[in-house]
Amino acid sequence: GDKIGRKKSILLYEIIHIIAMIGGAIAPNIYVLYVFRLVQGFGLGALLVVLFAGFTEYVPGRNRGVWSSRNSFIGNWAHPICNGIAFLIVTTGISYNMNWRIQYMIPSVLSIIASIIIAKKLPESPRWLEAQGRVDEADAILTKIEKEIEASTGKPLPPVTEEPKEVKQLPYSALFKGKLLRRTIVGSLVLIGMNTIQYTLMTWMPSLLKSMGYDTSQSQFMTMFGLFGAPFGIFIASLIMDKIPRRVMGVILLAAMAVLGVITGQQTTMTALIVTTFLLNTAIYMYVCYASAVYVPEMWPTSAKLSGSGFCNAIGRVSNIFFPFLVTSVAAGSMGSTGVFVLISVVAVIIGVCILIFGVETRGESVEDIGNVD
């Protein structure tokens, strides 16, 4: 992404995951599906990094958190919508051999539509073009945008007097020394917390509810209802993201998750579980928005933005490969499902302390100021 540009990267990874999803939908057996799932994960994992990190270059520092949160708000409606589709498919009696294939085809078609819109409408990041020494191309894009603004407002924009500065190209090794090393560590920890907590709840909630005596339809319904906390939480985050310092925001959200995790684990009735799961999801997805859409993507210089954000996301994903084994062990122990919620709380506390001690402040700073690591 740092080499070929933001727009080309988005389209490349869209194509990869679209092909993989269509291939998965028509897979003749589980082994072919494994292969397509692997390719799909590669495409989607890379796409998330490019989308969120690249977007920070298109908006000003004073309200970057709000706009990034709005992006996340729209995107995270996918979770309750997908669970709603799954619930409908299960209850309508579509065969097991077809229901998951339908789940694959729906987002693949939507992704094709999104790719066409991106190809036609999204300009390349002027900041990335400038970092590559392609100043004339960057100027042409911004000039076009300025003319559109002047035409819509009827007012001329002030002239630009600042000359373009030479952008220092940073090697990949720069992530592991000097000021960037601290950001690499903090970003990795922030996303380890996000992945382990978010995916534990998403992946294990139906199984946890089933272990508590609820049937498949009941657990699917409760999970779907709880996941409406996702867009609600991100909507709240979009309203306050640029009003609270980034470090403080992270610590508050992690503390809320720790408390709500313990409370949720103590509930025994369906109504109480739905309410507490909704509140827990609200806090979790406020943190997801904070971590994946705002804080980690914005803490890097332009020439290392996708490298840094990509590395931290990779570490977060790797932790999520191994964490389910710990969850399985805890769930099988004496505390059962309650132990899983306690585990979520412990992870939240540990990450919160790390952000409080080592976190860097980026709220309101321009991309250029954040990128000054000399």
Would you name each region that the model predicts?
Residues 1-374:
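Transmembrane-helix signature of 12-pass secondary carriers
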